[in-house]
């Protein structure tokens, strides 16, 4: 039979992705590791190694018991074997091309039409149970096989080892099988010198559309002594049950190799299994493009050679690929068991059975029994094995494909191997994510994993997922050996809800960035050794890791949410280290984030840099040690506080800690200063006390700073000249403080000598000059001492103080206290050295002459050194000392006082006094005004007072409630309009409902009444359940407020003795506010609830309404200028309102009652109020501010209603509301001593217009829409709201 020679590619039938996607979503995802290690590996070793399964490799990776049994299945015995031998002529022309089918095969291959599958297929002459052997071992030249499609068996063996085989010159080839009761396997073997694949090649495909008989299994073996290649257009497709054996010196497949391809509708319902065996390839196997899965849970296996290269690997979302590398030394043949001499054994058994035992009990078993025992050969089953040390799997890029099918827990694609090295190139990995989430597992059971490229989600580096649909990367190295290494040589950037899991002995990362939005999990809990990360950037990230080494940890806040931490959620062990910690500055205090640790024995940090509004909570780690630096990353601009929390903290040798009130350091356990230095930063004339929850230890040595000649200090106070005088400044407090000299090996809590040695290592500096002790060796030292203590005479005339040369002088204006519970200094002011004033000691002349230490014999009890001594301050200026005016005068800017009053008034002046003087001191105030021009000061004060006045305003505090109430007023008016359709019903309800069913037919029911009830619309006023989405905004010169939310209710028309409408509602709205300067931001949750009614008396309508509202507001002040930064804070309060309304109106009906005009008048009462402010600030906190107001209003309105059809309507309502009385009380807002009184609002006049309507969508289902605008004609504030909703009648 002729075969097709035209150029064709395979045409696959279309399938319903929606149908099969829904079905496959309920198929449970199974782990294939168990089959890999307990079934597949033994099958390989017991099958290939023994040679018992030659040609049956389809069983080696069958992914189930049946497939494992196939590994050792002997080939099916053919009924008849046809043999063809190439005779003379085929061995004479090496450059000639032949058509293999026409030249040799056609005489023993039949073909015909398969009516069940509507396609032509071919088979060995006589039937699929026969075999064809073609002997061409001496043939030369090139033999083309093209168009042999749907070859369904039996076996075909072509030996042409000196010739070239070209598959698919004009058309592709497909080798497959028929599934019958014999469950036969089709085996096709080609043995050639070279094999070229130029067109599609299919293995175990279904014939035609695939709707008919299923294929069983097919094994295609291609063996070439030199090489096997395919072109880019030659696609090789392996369907369920397909095996491809490749044996050659090298294999290079440039076209796509598709394992687990689908062909027919319904194939999605079950996974597919396919295998490629390259174990007999001596060189490298190269797959340019390998695809596993086709919208199905395909499971594929490659029995690999030593080196396997894959350009692009495409995995379907639920597919799995296993690449099995050979063991060290390759597969070895095993000895075959010798058959037992069963006849002799049986004879011996019979003799023994007929004999009498020692207990005279005879075994009844007659001799020469026909019962035979057949002993089978012993089967040797090997367990899992590691790939040889030189086995490598290289994949340039891995990509997963997905559809929108939703499955609980998502889908997982997997790549598993046992090679010594699994290397993923610079193309990296792309995970296609969809709803319910997707996971990619890359696993090397016995070796290492290296990834050179990035990790992408939906083809984006840093791509994100959605909550509940996370994208997950999983890597497992050395799962069985527990000795694998996972290495990532490219920076990893993970978007929101993208997770990374790594199990290995050692994991190495160049960089990981989860700071793009947070909500990530880095699960390294399966790393048994060390996790090494060069740079880790986090934001609200869950990090599960133990025993790590992080070169740099950067913690962002990103304003994700209040209290969103990066959480190290595993015990970090005792060998964890971070070289540098950087806490980035938060956006504002309510958006603070940070990092916390679950538990751990010890954490070593080399350098620690903290920032405002960020947290570091290590209280659950037993010990933390700082080895080099502990400082603020924003020391020149400390505009917010950090929160740093430790259990036991150690400052290592030569480490430096910068400490101020902005550090906000908590040590709940012990603190050890092991020869480090604490730099105390003076802010506002004070230093912050370092409080230790339990014990503190100060360990020092006799080491000398070669640059200064002083002992290396343990505590330093920088800018000590700015300390407030006549005040004790406590540096450290603890339950117990001990002191120790590590050079001498002594330590004690109360040893006087050790305490005095410690005091010499407590230093006060003015810039770089020490001011508590001066060591004078020459005139330059005299000048330096004068600079330190502020003595200009010593600087200008050092010769007058030459008597100090060779001596150490102690500044007795500074006293130091060190005992078992406190370390402090007391600054009276600098004393002045005199020639006979004492307080000096001679410098030693030995080898330690450079050491600047003061002798204990120095006077320490001078009268002016006592804490009780206070200087006599005298006001030398026009204004009292300590006022903001005095600060301007001392700065020689007296005229700016008048400018301040003229432009900012007394309120601005009082605010400046509070911010600079009352909350700090005159020194701080002087620094602020020196750095700020007068114009800028008044500008900032005016902006602040405007904002504070807005905060105090009850109108501002209840603005969101008013907008929500306005939205509901519009909705309620729409409901009343709808239920007031009293004039258009000209026929009774029964007749009207019957009219609606005209010309309709129904199945026989029990009664006509049942038909009427089930199918006719309800024209009587029914009970209605309604819901609306609402939105609104408030606009004025100071800023704008917006609101969005939902409202729902139920109402009904009562038609008894009294015609009336009654209803109730509830609503929720979230509002936000931003002023124009963006210095005031608010967010509030608001609720509104109430009842409404309308009573009819002929054309008269009486409306009544009562409602209440409550709002919880969270606001923050965010001034950017340094002058106002103390105002920045978060605060909250509650706002509430209650209202009752009553109105009367009269209906005028026109146009056959379709148009109704209704004028109305009404009165209302409103009660508005707010609670006191609660602030998180400890500097200038907002307090008090509660308000209450009662309003009485009168209104006049006119309304037009237009009813059309049986259910739809449109209306417009316009009116004026006039306040005729208001009274109330308010508690002034306070900022320390500064007060802000809420202004009393005048009586207001409001104009309002609203319109809306409703449209029927389906039986008893309606859509409504409305708009409303309210304008205060006095304050020029406008409120706008709209709604979109649904109603259901029943």
UniProtKB/Swiss-Prot annotation:
Keywords: Cell outer membrane, Membrane, Periplasm, Secreted, Signal, Toxin, Transmembrane, Transmembrane beta strand, Virulence. SUPFAM superfamilies: Autotransporter. Residues 1018-1290 form the Autotransporter domain. Residues 330-339 have a biased composition (Basic and acidic residues). Residues 340-362 have a biased composition (Low complexity). GO terms for cellular component: cell outer membrane; cell surface; extracellular region; periplasmic space. GO terms for molecular function: toxin activity. SMART domains: Autotransporter (SM00869). PROSITE patterns: AUTOTRANSPORTER. Induces vacuolation of eukaryotic cells. Causes ulceration and gastric lesions. The signal peptide, cleaved at the inner membrane, guides the autotransporter protein to the periplasmic space. Then, insertion of the C-terminal translocator domain in the outer membrane forms a hydrophilic pore for the translocation of the passenger domain to the bacterial cell surface, with subsequent cleavage. This is Vacuolating cytotoxin autotransporter. It comes from Helicobacter pylori (strain ATCC 700392 / 26695) (Campylobacter pylori).
């Amino acid at each position: 039979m002729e075969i097709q020679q035209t150029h064709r590619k395979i045409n696959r039938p279309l399938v319903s992705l929606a149908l099969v996607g829904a079905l496959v979503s309920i198929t449970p995802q199974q782990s294939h590791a168990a089959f890999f290690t307990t079934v597949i590996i033994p099958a390989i070793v017991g099958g290939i190694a023994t040679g018992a399964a030659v040609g049956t490799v389809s069983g080696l990776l069958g992914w189930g018991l049946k497939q494992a049994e196939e590994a050792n299945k002997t080939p099916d015995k053919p009924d008849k074997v046809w043999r063809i031998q190439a005779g003379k002529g085929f061995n004479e022309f090496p450059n000639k091309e032949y058509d293999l089918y026409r030249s040799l095969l056609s005489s023993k291959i039949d073909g015909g039409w398969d009516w069940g599958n509507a396609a032509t297929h071919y088979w060995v002459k006589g039937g699929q149970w026969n075999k064809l052997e073609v002997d061409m071992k001496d043939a030369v030249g090139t033999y083309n096989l093209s168009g042999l499609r749907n070859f369904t068996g039996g076996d075909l063996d072509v030996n042409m080892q000196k010739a070239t085989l070209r598959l698919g010159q004009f058309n592709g080839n497909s080798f497959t099988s028929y599934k019958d009761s014999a469950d036969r396997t089709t085996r096709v073997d080609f043995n050639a010198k070279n094999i070229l694949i130029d067109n599609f090649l299919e293995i175990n495909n279904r014939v035609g559309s695939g709707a008919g008989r299923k294929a069983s299994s097919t094994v295609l073996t291609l063996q070439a002594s030199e090489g096997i290649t395919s072109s880019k257009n030659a696609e090789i497709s392996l369907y369920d049950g397909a095996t491809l054996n490749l044996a050659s010196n090298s294999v290079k497949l440039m076209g796509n190799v598709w394992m687990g391809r689908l062909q027919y509708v319904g194939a999605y319902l079950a996974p597919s299994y396919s295998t490629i065996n390259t174990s007999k390839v001596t060189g490298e196997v190269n797959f340019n493009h390998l695809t596993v899965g086709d919208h199905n849970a395909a499971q594929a296996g490659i029995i690999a050679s030593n080196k396997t290269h894959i350009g692009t690997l495409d995995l379907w979302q639920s597919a799995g690929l296993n690449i099995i590398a050979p063991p060290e030394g390759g597969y070895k043949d095993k000895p075959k068991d010798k058959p037992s001499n069963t006849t002799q054994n049986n004879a011996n058994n019979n003799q023994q059975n007929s004999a009498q035992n020692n207990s005279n009990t005879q075994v009844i078993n007659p001799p020469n029994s026909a019962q035979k025992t057949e002993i089978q050969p012993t089967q040797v089953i090997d367990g899992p094995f590691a790939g040889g040390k030189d086995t490598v799997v290289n994949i340039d890029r891995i990509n997963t494909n997905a559809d929108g099918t939703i499955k609980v827990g998502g889908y997982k694609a997997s790549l598993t191997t046992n090679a010594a090295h699994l290397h993923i190139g610079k193309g990296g990995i792309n995970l296609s994510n969809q709803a319910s989430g997707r996971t990619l597992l890359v696993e090397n059971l016995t070796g290492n994993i290296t990834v050179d490229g990035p990790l992408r989600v939906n083809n984006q580096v840093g791509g994100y997922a959605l909550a509940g649909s996370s994208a997950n990367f999983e890597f497992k190295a050395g799962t069985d050996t527990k000795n694998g290494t996972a290495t990532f040589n490219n920076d990893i950037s993970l978007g929101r809800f993208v997770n990374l899991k790594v199990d290995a002995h050692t994991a190495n990362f160049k960089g990981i960035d989860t700071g793009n939005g947070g909500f990530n999990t880095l699960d390294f809990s399966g790393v048994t050794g060390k996790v090494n990360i060069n740079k880790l950037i986090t934001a609200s990230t869950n990090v599960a890791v133990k025993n790590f080494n992080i070169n740099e940890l950067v913690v962002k806040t990103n304003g994700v949410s209040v209290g969103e931490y990066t959480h190290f959620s595993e015990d970090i062990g005792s060998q964890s280290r971070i070289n540098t910690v950087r806490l980035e500055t938060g956006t504002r205090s309510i958006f603070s984030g940070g990092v916390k640790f679950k538990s751990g024995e010890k954490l070593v940090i080399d350098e620690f840099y903290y920032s405002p509004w960020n947290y570091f909570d290590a209280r659950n780690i037993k010990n933390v040690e700082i080895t080099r630096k502990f400082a603020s990353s924003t020391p020149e601009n400390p505009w917010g506080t950090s929160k740093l929390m430790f259990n036991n903290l150690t400052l290592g040798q030569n480490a430096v800690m910068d400490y101020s009130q902005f550090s906000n350091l908590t040590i709940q356990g012990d603190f050890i200063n092991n020869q480090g230095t604490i730099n105390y930063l003076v802010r506002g004339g004070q230093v912050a006390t370092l409080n230790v929850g339990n014990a503190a230890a100060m360990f020092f040595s006799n080491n000398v700073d070669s640059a200064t000649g002083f002992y290396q200090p343990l505590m330093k106070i920088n800018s000590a000249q700015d300390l407030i005088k006549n005040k004790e400044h406590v540096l450290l407090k603890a339950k117990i403080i001990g002191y120790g000299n590590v050079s001498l090996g002594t330590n004690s809590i109360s040893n006087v000598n050790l305490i005095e040695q410690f005091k010499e290592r407590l230093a006060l500096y003015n810039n770089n000059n020490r001011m508590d002790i001066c060591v004078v060796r020459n005139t330059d030292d005299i000048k330096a001492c004068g600079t330190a203590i502020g003595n200009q005479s010593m600087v200008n005339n050092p010769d007058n103080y030459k008597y100090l040369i060779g001596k150490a002088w102690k500044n007795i204006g500074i006293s130091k206290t060190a005992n078992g519970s406190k370390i402090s200094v007391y600054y009276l002011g600098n004393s002045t050295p005199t020639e006979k004033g004492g307080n000096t000691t001679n410098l030693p002349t030995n080898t330690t002459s450079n050491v600047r230490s003061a002798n204990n014999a120095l006077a320490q009890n001078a009268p002016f050194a006592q804490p009780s001594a206070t200087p006599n301050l005298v006001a030398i200026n026009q204004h009292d000392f300590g006022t903001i005016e005095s600060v301007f005068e001392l700065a020689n800017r007296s005229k700016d006082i008048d400018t301040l009053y003229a432009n900012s008034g007394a309120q601005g002046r009082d605010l400046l006094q509070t911010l600079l003087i009352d909350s700090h001191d005159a020194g701080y105030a002087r620094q602020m005004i020196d750095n700020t021009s007068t114009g800028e000061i008044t500008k900032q004060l005016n902006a602040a007072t405007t904002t504070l006045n807005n905060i105090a305003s009850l109108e501002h505090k209840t603005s969101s409630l008013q907008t929500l109430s306005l939205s509901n007023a519009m909705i309620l008016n729409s409901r009343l309009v709808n239920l007031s359709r009293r004039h258009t019903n000209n026929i009774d309800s029964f007749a009207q409902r019957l009219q609606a069913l005209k010309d309709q037919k129904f199945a026989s029911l029990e009664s006509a009444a049942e038909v009427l009830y089930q199918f006719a619309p309800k024209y009587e006023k029914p009970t209605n359940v309604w819901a609306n989405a609402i939105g609104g905004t408030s606009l004025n010169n100071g800023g704008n407020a917006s609101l969005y939310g939902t409202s729902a209710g139920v109402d009904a028309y009562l038609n008894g003795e009294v015609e009336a409408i009654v209803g109730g509602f509830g609503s929720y709205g979230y509002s936000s506010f931003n002023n124009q300067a963006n210095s005031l931001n608010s967010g509030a949750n608001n609720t509104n609830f109430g009842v409404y009614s309308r009573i009819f008396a002929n054309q008269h309508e009486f409306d009544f309404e009562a409602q209440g509202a409550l709002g919880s507001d969270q606001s923050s002040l965010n001034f950017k200028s340094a002058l106002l930064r103390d105002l920045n804070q978060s605060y909250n309060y509650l706002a509430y309102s209650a209202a009752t309304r009553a109105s009367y109106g009269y209906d005028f009906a026109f146009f056959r009652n379709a148009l109704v005009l209704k004028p109305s008048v009404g009165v209302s009462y409103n009660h508005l109020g707010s609670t006191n402010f609660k602030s998180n600030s400890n500097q200038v906190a907002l307090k008090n501010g509660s308000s209450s107001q009662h309003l009485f209003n009168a209104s006049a309105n006119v309304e037009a209603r237009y009813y059309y059809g049986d259910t739809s309507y449109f209306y417009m309502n316009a009116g004026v509301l006039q306040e005729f009385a208001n009274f109330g009380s308010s508690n002034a807002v306070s900022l320390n001593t500064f007060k802000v009184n809420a202004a009393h609002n005048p009586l207001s006049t409001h104009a309002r217009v609203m319109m809306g309507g409703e449209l029927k969508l389906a039986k008893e289902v309606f859509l409504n829409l409305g708009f409303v605008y309210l304008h205060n004609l006095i304050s020029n504030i406008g409120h706008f709201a709209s709604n979109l909703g649904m109603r259901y009648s029943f």
